């Protein structure tokens, strides 16, 4: 049996400890001994980006925000889907996570981050949202397990009314706001609707045909056509 290697540790501003592991060529980030994400399971992250970005493929000068770099799969799927003139802003709060992805020895997202369309920001995505009123055609937030249960307490505001309104304010007309979640959450879905959004809830698996089910919330301002 091949050993599990602990490669590095990061601590977020609220004290959450993230640990990077490698096993048999696959990488994972763990919190409290539990995989938060893995290079073996990223179908739902790919699906999130494809659902949000495919309708924008023919739109000129598209601007997209991704909250949370993770292991780079949402970013890579967005870049595969969007046009050459698109701009993708990625906000990641943990400098170590950025470093892991940029490390060519780990084969994670170094090539994607070097893409000329990418604007990588070492910052809390909440700060980027506050500074970006009316700037994005789409916002994808994959910064935690979803509204409940949170692994990082500092992410809570993003799933509350104030955070949802902040994200909505950062959208351009006809913009999309999407969230990745490990679980379904009827209360969060209702919070999106209470903010004046129409919401599509999509269930998708960690692998293309197997693995745990994850939930994607894809929201738009009510009354706008697709």
What does each model-identified segment do?
Residues 217-226:
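C-terminal lobe and adjacent flexible extensions of AdoMet/dcAdoMet transferase-like proteins
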Residues 175:
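Glycine-centered, phosphate/nucleic-acid-interacting loop/turn motifs that mediate DNA/RNA or nucleotide
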Residues 42, 46-171, 179-180, 190, ...:
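The AdoMet/dcAdoMet-binding core of the Class I SAM-like
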Residues 1-30:
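N-terminal auxiliary segments of SAM/dcSAM-dependent transferases
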Residues 182-184:
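Active-site beta-loop-alpha junctions enriched in small/polar residues
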């Amino acid at each position: 049996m091949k050993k599990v290697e602990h490669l590095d540790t990061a601590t977020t501003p609220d004290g959450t400890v993230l640990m990077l592991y490698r096993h048999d060529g696959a990488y994972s980030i763990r919190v409290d001994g539990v995989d938060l994400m893995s290079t073996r399971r990223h179908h739902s992250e790919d699906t999130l980006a494809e659902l949000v970005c495919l309708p924008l493929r023919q739109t000129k000068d598209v601007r997209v925000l991704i909250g949370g770099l993770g292991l780079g799969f949402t970013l890579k799927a967005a870049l595969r889907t969007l046009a050459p003139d698109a701009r993708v802003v990625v906000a990641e709060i943990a400098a170590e996570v950025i470093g892991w992805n940029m490390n060519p020895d780990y084969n994670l997202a170094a090539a994607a981050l070097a893409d000329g369309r990418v604007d990588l920001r070492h910052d809390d995505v909440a700060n980027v949202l506050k500074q970006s009123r009316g700037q994005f055609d789409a916002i994808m937030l994959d910064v935690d397990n979803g509204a409940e249960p949170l692994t990082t307490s500092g992410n809570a505001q993003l799933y509350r009314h104030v955070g949802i309104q902040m994200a909505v304010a950062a959208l351009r007309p006809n913009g999309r706001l999407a969230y990745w979640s490990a679980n379904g959450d009827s209360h969060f879905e209702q919070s999106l609707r209470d903010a004046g959004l129409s919401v599509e809830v999509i269930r998708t698996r960690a692998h293309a045909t197997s693995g745990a089910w994850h939930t994607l919330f894809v929201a738009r301002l009510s009354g706008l056509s697709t």
